[in-house]
Structures are given as C-alpha cells and as structure tokens.
From Swiss-Prot:
This is MICOS complex subunit Mic60. Residues 66-609 are mitochondrial intermembrane. InterPro entries: MIC60. The modification N6-acetyllysine is found at K174, K403. Component of the mitochondrial contact site and cristae organizing system (MICOS) complex, composed of at least MICOS10/MIC10, CHCHD3/MIC19, CHCHD6/MIC25, APOOL/MIC27, IMMT/MIC60, APOO/MIC23/MIC26 and MICOS13/MIC13. This complex was also known under the names MINOS or MitOS complex. The MICOS complex associates with mitochondrial outer membrane proteins SAMM50, MTX1 and MTX2 (together described as components of the mitochondrial outer membrane sorting assembly machinery (SAM) complex) and DNAJC11, mitochondrial inner membrane protein TMEM11 and with HSPA9. GO terms for biological process: cristae formation; mitochondrial calcium ion homeostasis; neuron cellular homeostasis. It is a single-pass membrane protein. The modification Phosphoserine is found at S112, S113, S175, S340, S342. It comes from Rattus norvegicus. GO terms for cellular component: MICOS complex; mitochondrial inner membrane; mitochondrial intermembrane space; mitochondrion. PANTHER family: MICOS COMPLEX SUBUNIT MIC60, MITOFILIN. Residues 127-162 are annotated as: Disordered.
Length: 609
C-alpha cells in the first residue's frame, strides 16, 4: 500500500500544482520526441510506463483517500471531477460541518460544594497555524507554471489542509467549552440550592427539637417557639422546592451536554478526541458532585422525618396522658398541671391522690413491660437493619467499583485514541514528505508533457474561440433583426389599441351624458310624484309649477317632455291639485258616511231613532 501511495503522490502533486486544469496524456508527447531509429520500441516502453504510472497513481490516490477523509477533501478541492471518481468508487464522502473552533487543553473540572468552573483564562488555547496557500486561478490557455511555483504549491497544500483541520477542531473545542460553562453554571446553582435546602432542613429540625425539649415553658414564650418552628417549616418547604426545581434543570443540562458529546463523537473529527475526553471527565465530575449533594439533602430529610415522627409521638403521648388524668380526676379544673403545689394542696383530696399514685404505679409497670418488649423488638430490628445496611453498602460498593472501572476504561480509551492520533499524524507527515519527493523527481518530465499539452490546448482554444465568435456574431445579427421586427409589430399593435381606446372613451362619454339626462328626468319625475303624494295642513292643494318647471329645465331638448308639460292645465300649475293623502282622507270620510246611510232600511229607521 505504501508503494502504491508513493506512486499516487506523483500524480496528485503534479495535478494539484496545476490546479487540475490539464489532463496528463503522456503518449502523444513521447511519440513526438522519439527518434526515427528507435521509435517503435521507445514508444511501446513509454506507453506501458505511462499507463502503469497513471494507473498506479490513481489507485494509490483512491486507497489513501479511502483511509484519510481530509486527503480526499483536499484532492477534490484541487483536481476537477475527482469528486465524481471518488463518488463512483468509494461512495459519498462523510459530511463534516466546518465550524470555527478553538483548540483548548484538556483539564479535569473539579466541582466541590461551591463548585468552580474553569474559565477561558484557565484553559490555554493552542495557536492555530496560518494558511498561506495561494488560490489556483489559472485559465485554460495560461502557460505552464515553472518548477519553483510547483514546489511552492506542493509545500503549501498540506498547510492548507492542516489549517482546515485545525479550524474545525477549534470550532468543536469552542462549542464544547461553551456547553461545559453553561452546564457547570447550572450545576453550581443547583449545588448551592441543595446546600441551602440542607441548611433549611437542619434549622427546622433544630428548632423543633428545642421546642419539644423545653416542655416546661408556658405562655407567650412557648407560642413564640412554635411560631419560630412554623416559620422554619415554611423556609424548609420553600428551599426544598427550589432545590427540586434546580435539580430538574441541572439534569436537563447534563443530558444536553451528554447529547452534545455523543454528537461530537459521531462526527469523528481528527484531533478532537482530547477535547471530547476532557469534556467527558468534567461531565462525570459534575454528576458525582451533584449526586453527593443530593445524598446530603436526602440524609437531612431522613433525619427531619425522624424528628417529625418523634414530635408526633410525643404530642400523642401527652394527649393520652392528659385524657387519663382527666378520667381519674374529673372534678379538677383542666389545666391544673400549670398550678403550683401550694395551690393544689387544697384542691386534691386523699382519694384523688391515692388514685393518682395507683395510676402512676400501673403506668410505670405498663411502661416497663413496653420498654422490655420494645428492647427485644428493637434488637431484632437492629439486626435486620444491619443486614439491610450491609446489602446497601455492598450495592453501593459495587456501584462505586463499576463507576471507577468505567472511568478507568474511559481514561485508557482516551490514551489509546491519543496514541492513535499521534501515529496517524506521523504517518500523514511521512506520506506528505514522500509525495513531495516524488513530485520533485518527476517535475522535468511533467513540464515537458505539459508544454506540449499547452500548445495543443492553445491551438484548440484559439480555433474554438474563432468559431464561437463567428457563431455569436451571426446570432447577434439574427437576434437584432428579430428584436427590430418585434418592436415594429408591438408599436403597430399599441397604436391600434390606442385608437380603439379613444373611440371607446368617446362612446362611453356620450352614454354617460345620456344617462345623466335620464337620471335628472327621473329625479324630477320622482319629485313631482312625491309632491302629489304629500300635502300640508294649511294647503290641501299642491301647486305643480316648480316640479313641472324642473322637468322642463332638465329636458329642454326633448320634444316629448316639452309637449307633455305643455299639456298640463294652468290651474294645476298655479292653484294646484289635491294630494294623494288628501284624497285618501276624503275617501275614508265618504266611506264612513256611506256606511251609515247603508244602515237605514226601507222604513227609514236606523239605530239613531
């Protein structure tokens, strides 16, 4: 494989020097330079050597491109149509997102109860190498470059690949650093909230113990103590709720960070393994610190639960004892326990005292029996608790051992990946050195071949250029004539359309004038009809002179309208006519009288007689 890669280096270096603008065709130049005496043998040897050289170079290039994706990317960028060849032989290239990244030195993130996250100043950045690779921009007809320029490009192409790889690695490191900073900030806040919850739980337990121990205090002091206990309980609930919310948020951030690390692993970026390993170590430290502080909160809550149960049992025992005393001495005023002995001397009788003493003896015997039974029971409970504790400690020990083994395996894997990366870099450097040497050894031969190709391509280019120019000139004249004809046709069409628009506008104006006159006539007739319908109380008749005059004015050029208005009697114009309302009212009056007349029979009798 190394020999094939060395052979491929010549082709890749030569083609990368010329930016992939020319194709190597060694047979024709060799035939032109061959002498007449040994043309057959020399041509066959050169043809065979050329085919072997080109085939070995292409095969070695494909094999090395399959092993190194960055080398494949550089060849695809430098040599045209090489991406299609790689796609047919090797398939599609793995996709890598070129994000800006800054390489950082890996370091463990130590988070204590007040965790501190390493900032940018604590994570020194590696200096990125500046890329000085010139962008190839030679055209098809440019002369072949000199040997010195080829060597320069051969030297700078690896630097360009190195700079691209460093750029991608730096972007990955920057993204991991930002995600770690955010996760560490949330974890630190969560740890602070958990510690505050522990302090609140301990404060509540302490105040509750104090209030239960000082049972002899009565009055306002006792009330103040219980108010303090209630306040501590509220603070405890608030702190525990805040700690739970912060813990959920921290778990979400840790899951996001874990997803980011897994995505970075899947991308398989060269040189990114140290940063991914450092991020995993810091994430593991955060998880361990968070678990420890959560265990502290759980332990504090367990202790507080025991104190609360103890308080409930004490309160229940006091209530039971008070009920027993009330049943023994029902005549004594409640609350006698707070009285002094001198006050109780005249209150309790001999029978009451004997009853209290007898009850105290029975109670002591009962408590002694319960104490003995409790001791035996607790002994069994202690044995069971010890067994459970041993099992829990064994499980915790197994879990701790598993975590330690996992951490150790991750460290070994990281070290192995680091060594593999170093060996890979050394192999790449050696391969690039061999490629440069092979390219320098065959530069003279390539220069001669490329000069011949340059002359051929220049001749072909000039011939194609003259043909294309003549075709373009003919095409230009044809398109100019077509545009002139189309322009003339468009002008004629627009002129005809303009004439049609003018005629349509004139006819529309005449129609609008006729419609306006008809509308005025209609309005005048409607006014006349309205005046004939309505009337006022002072004037039963309505003169029609003004309405008729309006009709005459609006239709002065209409003979039919003038004849119709002239036929109206002058009395109607001056005196007026009865309106429709007046006639309707008179008709109703006449109808009423006619109805009354109809009620008179043949004998002239009616309801009025």
């Amino acid at each position: 494989m190394l020999r094939a890669c060395q052979l491929s280096g010549v082709t890749v270096a030569a083609q990368s020097c010329l930016c992939g603008k020319f194709v190597l065709r060694p047979l024709r130049p060799c035939r032109r330079y061959s002498t007449s005496s040994s043309s057959g043998v020399t041509a066959g040897k050169i043809a065979g050597a050329g085919l072997l050289f080109v085939g070995g170079g292409i095969g070695g290039t494909i094999l090395y491109a399959k092993w190194d994706s960055h080398f494949r990317e550089s060849v695809e960028k430098t040599i045209p149509y090489s991406d299609k060849l790689f796609g047919m032989v090797l398939g599609s290239a793995p996709y890598t997102v070129p994000l800006p990244k800054k390489p950082i030195q890996s370091g463990p993130l130590k988070i204590s109860s007040v965790s501190e996250v390493m900032t940018d100043s604590e994570l020194p950045m590696a200096q990125t190498q500046e890329t000085n690779g010139d962008t190839p921009a030679s055209a098809a007809g440019d002369p072949a470059p000199e040997v010195e320029h080829e060597d320069t490009i051969n030297t700078e192409c690896p630097n360009t690949d190195e700079g691209t790889s460093t750029f991608v690695t730096a972007a990955l490191a920057k993204s991991l650093e930002d995600a770690l900073n955010q996760t560490a900030t949330v974890t630190r806040q969560t740890i602070t909230a958990q510690n505050a919850a522990v302090q609140a739980v301990k404060a509540h337990s302490s105040t509750l113990k104090t209030a239960m121990d000082n049972s002899e205090i009565a009055g306002e002091k006792k009330s103040a103590q219980w108010r303090t206990v209630e306040g501590a309980l509220k603070e405890r609930r608030k702190a525990v709720d805040e700690a739970a919310d912060a813990l959920l948020k921290a778990k979400e951030e840790l899951e996001k960070m874990k997803t980011i690390i897994e995505d970075a692993k899947k991308r398989e970026i060269a040189g990114a393994t140290p940063y991914i390993t450092a991020a995993e170590e810091k994430l593991h430290s955060m998880i361990v610190d968070l678990d420890s502080v959560v265990k502290k909160v759980q332990a504090a809550q367990s202790e507080a639960k025991v104190v609360s149960q103890y308080h409930e049992l004490v309160v229940q025992a006091r209530d039971d004892f008070r009920k027993e005393l009330d049943s023994i001495t029902p005549d004594i005023t409640p609350g006698w326990k707070g009285m002094s002995i001198s006050d109780l001397a005249g209150t309790l009788s001999t029978d009451d005292l004997n009853a209290l003493i007898a009850h105290a003896h029975r109670r002591i015997d009962q408590l002694n029996r319960e104490l003995a039974q409790q001791k035996a029971t607790e002994k069994q409970h202690i044995e069971l608790a010890l067994e459970r504790q041993k099992l829990e400690e064994k499980r915790a020990f197994d879990s701790a051992v598993a975590k330690a083994l996992e951490h150790h395996r991750s460290e070994i894997q990281a070290e192995q990946d680091r060594k593999v990366e170093e060996v890979r870099d050394a192999m790449e450097n050696e391969m690039r050195t061999q490629l440069r040497r092979q390219a320098a050894a065959h530069t003279d031969h390539l220069r001669d071949v490329l000069k011949v190709q340059e002359q051929e391509l220049k001749f072909e280019f000039e011939q194609d250029l003259s043909e294309k120019l003549s075709e373009q000139e003919l095409e230009f004249h044809r398109r100019s004539q077509e545009q002139m004809d189309n322009f003339t046709l468009d002008i004629n069409t627009a002129y005809a359309r303009l004439r049609g628009i003018e005629q349509a506008v004139q006819s529309h104006a005449v129609a609008e004038e006729e419609a306006r006159k008809a509308h005025q006539l209609w309005l005048s007739v409607e006014a006349l009809k309205y005046s004939m319908k309505t009337s006022s109380a002072e004037m039963p008749t309505i003169p029609l002179g003004s309405a008729v005059e309006a009709i005459r004015v609006s239709c002065s050029d209409n003979e039919f309208t003038q004849a119709l208005t002239a036929a109206i009697p002058p009395e109607s114009l001056t005196r007026g006519v009865y309106s429709e309302e007046t006639l309707r009212a008179r008709f109703y009056a006449v109808q009423k009288l006619a109805g009354r007349v109809a009620m008179i029979d043949e004998t002239k009798n009616s309801l009025y007689q």
